[in-house]
Amino acid sequence: MKGNIARIVAQFKQSWNKELEDDAIVRACQEAGHQWRERELGPVATVKMFLLQILFGNVACEFVPHLAGKDVTGSAYCAARGRLPLAALQSLLSRCTTKMAACVRDTGLWLGHRLFLIDGSGFSMSDTPALQKHFGQPPGQAAGCGFPTAHWLALVHFGSGLFQKVITGALRKSELSGVSQMHPELEAGDVLLGDRAFSSYGHVALLMSRSLHGIFRARATLIVDFTPGRPHAIPGKGKSGCQPGRPRSKWISSAGPLDQIVEWFRPVEVPAWLTAEDWASLPATLRIRVLRYTIARPGFRVHLVTLLTTLLDPERYPQEKLAEAYGLRWTVETCLKHLKTTMKMDVLRCLTVCGVQKELTMFLLAYNLVRMVVLEAARCQGVPPERISFIDALRWLATAQPGDVLPNLVIISQRPGRFEPRVRKRRPKVFPLMKNPRAVLKQALLAQQLAP
């Protein structure tokens, strides 16, 4: 059968290969309480076909039997896929990811630390009542004129590009509402990189309680003053807390120009993603480091960047290294682009909540498999993993046969400082946006006698 990924990647001789073998799939289904009769489309064959479908760009179910060389209909495959328990697929993903992460544990260390990236994103899906109710749709769209959209939070290992964990939720759900579920995936001493959304007092306090570190861009609402011995305001402390313009942190020491150690006071307001009890249990102050630097490129505006970090030692973690680390945060955007654009996960096809979650699970498994191919190619070809073409690795994995040896993959040219304007040259066909449900528009066409 085409698409036997376990046999294709067996040449890598790594522990995670075994988690894709037939016995592992059967064990995952049994542990999920799934019962079946061995037919043409048992769970082993269905999982392999599902993975093949994703690797080929989430093609239509009718096309998958042709890809797999199976004499079954597309509807039979779709029904078999629906019978797969979500828990079994999640177990496969979890076990594979755990074994993969162990293989790349020391890949891409930053000053001796493992580096992880966190970011939020979204994906669209079919317009069904069940999906609308569970996920919701973007504001400004009338009922029947938009599509349900899910929000998801992703944790990515910098050195390998593996998706370590993903949490999905309703569109209007705060990114921080699920961030604490990411922390158990990290170990003491790991460093988490994120944008302004993750630089809140509550999140930093939760990180520090687990001996984790963070490097985040400071929120615009954070008042920063690098003047030594400057005055400050203590939230909730009478007149002291009601002095606008004063930082809500106490200056402790200078770590260099535009670089300081401060005592950050816990705000009075309880964030919506924490309970009052959890908020009260956080420490009243946090000792953090705040620094500022500029990014200047010829022909561009100067950007001012203010970072907030728990890495306090200026000798071990100089300002330029912290700025360099924060610049690596863009890696997570590249990973999301590969998953959503290259692999075509931007719009999922299933019609139920469980089906969408299965689809997402298989996308993550397929993505991590491609990432391991990239890492193996980088090792064999003697180049950094970021130089190996992701799409070339995807194409090889999708079309390889058992026994095929991994060839030399395309190496991306080094183009430091390269940038392109975010515009499209090819003009799309212009159609008006749907502002009324389809049934209403059809009635309008009939009334105007414009229907064919």
Where in this protein do the model-derived segments appear?
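A short, well-structured juxtamembrane/interface segment
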Residues: 98-106
